Amino acid sequence: MILLDYVFLKRCLLLFVKVVCILLDLSALRERLRDYLSRTIPGNLELYNVYCLLQYRVDCLSLLLTKPSRLYHIVLRHQGGDINSADLAFSIAFLSPLSIILGNPGLVRELLDLVKSGRDDEFLEVVVKNLKHGETRGGEA
């Protein structure tokens, strides 16, 4: 019985450590993304933060890394409901920089498809997977 409890506790601890590491990685990614966007598209974060804070009480980068489909809908409304414009704006403003930082610029289309279909959990899985690979590839920014 004690051995079983030890094995269970060890697995729980390893899972906890893994989750904490992912959260720390996402926090660092968020900061790198904020710095990159502030340098390359000045004022864009501030604009979208107004919308995000008013509607969801959270900044746009936190929304991007938790509920990206909500951020996409904010961009869609800002673009007057024009899907093509929203796709382009969302890709340029958020997905391309994210993909560059992750070291995989080819991710934009996949991430956009996941966001548009509301598959936020899968979006996050792709980001986390590429975050780990990006460390070995040496993502930019």
Model-derived features: positions:
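Amphipathic alpha-helical interaction modules
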Residues: 43-96
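Short terminal alpha-helical segments
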Residues: 6-60
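Acidic-enriched, low-complexity/disordered segments with a strong bias for Aspartate over Glutamate
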Residues: 5, 25, 35, 59, ...
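Short amphipathic alpha-helical segments that mediate assembly, nucleic-acid/protein binding
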Residues: 9-10, 26-34, 46-47, 68-71, ...
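Amphipathic alpha-helical binding modules
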Residues: 93-141
